[in-house]
């Protein structure tokens, strides 16, 4: 994409980006190229990772995050290309539709990082889920409303729902895999529209801060209701940390979305210092939730057969081990879908599933328990997997089991290896993230005109136009309105 943009900018002699003799490189092509290079560079690192540690069936290994990040964040570079190459004149219906689709694609791209939770068998702290939802909504919807004007957040949301819904139907209906659930972002979009209607978007920092607060409260409450209504599972509403990390992520991401809207006309852009602090807060929030520990918990697991399934009874030692759990239940997967069952307390430390779960065939079934940063599991049934030398864990009428780190069961393909491939993998991810972030900031700055000459000559103000003092009192245009002079798209 970066090469194609450079080719046409050169052929058209477009007044964009960097000029090297007769070659014109759009500013937006630079992060697009960096994203592609980072994603492609992750493939040999991923092969090395697998050779050193075995297969890692998770979205969130460092090499997989480089792949997903390169593709998902390319949607941001695509929007920057539309801004840089926008035609002069007022945008047509088609042009605004393309921009709305691009901004909806940003929400899709950022939601890719939630894929670890989309299929209902996550390996990380479940509190990440509302944090990622708040961050994606804060960044994409705040940017969309600033770029598209009134109803911009709703337009981007509609584009997102069309794309995500279509993909989910293909995965489930055509490919016959587990239906991937996804957040709706409806409450968040309504919040952003309401804030913009109330405060306007001219003061981008104020608009972003208030929108972020609304997303982290009303928006996440809406997602809690959606998750509950759809039977997806439970968000960790009983985890006190949610009142700190979700607002931190939502507000920080909203400020970053407001900062990226710098090329769009505003009375006051987000200060660079505020954007930098927001980036540090968001990164710190995501990194703070990475640790996964194991508590001293044991269980007696009893099965009551129901056909080829079973009701699972779990007796915990100590009895109060799940009294403050952020997630606790039984989940089955890999047998042709996903089955989850709640564990209802029937006595001190004794729990029974609310439905039978599979314990035969290709299914894998385990009891999951999370308590803040403790992410644990105990096996119920796992078939043998001779390809990776993993023995069967049969479905016994009664089993004594100690809870272990959940990846011990979820990633039975993994094995120990040397440290240096891990250093390369995590180092590559950190380098890519820093370079990509810096390039996005650079391009947004250049396209704003703060560090570059205007892309096209500014039109002469008509004689009947209001004088500067009066003009400064008029409301600033709240949407993407390029300079006049060339035909519209």
In which residue ranges do the predicted regions lie?
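Internal/C-terminal transmembrane anchor helices
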Residues: 267-292, 489
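Membrane-interface helix-loop-helix junctions at boundaries between adjacent transmembrane segments
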Residues: 18-34, 40-101, 115-121
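Membrane-interface interhelical loops and short amphipathic "cap" helices
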Residues: 1, 45-65, 113-133, 164-177, ...
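Hydrophobic cores of alpha-helical transmembrane segments in multi-pass inner/ER membrane proteins
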Residues: 1-9, 65-82, 130-147, 183-198, ...
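Cytoplasmic C-terminal tails of single-pass
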Residues: 450-489
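Membrane-interfacial entry segments at the cytosolic side of transmembrane helices
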Residues: 91-98, 204-209, 264-277
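Aromatic-anchored segments of alpha-helical transmembrane domains
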Residues: 38-44, 105-114, 159-172, 214-224, ...
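N-terminal soluble domains immediately following signal/targeting peptides that reside
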Residues: 289-451
